[in-house]
Amino acid sequence: QECSEIIREMDPTARTMRIITTCNGGEGTDWNVIQNWSGTYGGDVTKYGKELSQKNQLLNGEYGAWRSIDLHTEPGEFEANGVWSESRMCQLMETKIRLAEQAKDSVCGQFQWIFSSHDNPGRRQPDEAFRKIDKVGPFNYKGLVTPWEEPLDVYYMYRANYVPAAKDPMVYLV
């Protein structure tokens, strides 16, 4: 109720509001943002650009991919139910970047969830891991850097796509 009152005070023109809940049984609050997790929790990642272009989809406020710590696989076709490797994460995220850039005239923006993989107290992870080591925490492993702030392959992929080489050149060897 307190969050609803704050939102209403900040934007008295808002006719509808998103559901406001506590997260994972915790004491904090959260309100739902527009999300598109195609390729991560199901759905077809190749339709991401078309989904962003829909009239009711002006912004994607959350998208990402699971990964398994330091697990690498050989490149190949994207597999929707493939191994949650660093390589698959990069492939999924780069597909979303490419399709979002193609749809940029139809959408005001998108942002990736989340910069840093983080501890997620109260969250049970019985099925959200590929290997037992991924259940350490529990952590949300969708970040561009590890919980210890080590950049991942996907971090460098984003940097290569969004930081001009003329401004800040980089070489990344895998």
Describe each model-derived feature in a short phrase.
Residues 1-153, 158:
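Substrate-binding/catalytic cleft of secreted carbohydrate-active enzymes
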Residues 157-174:
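Surface beta-strand/loop "capping" patches
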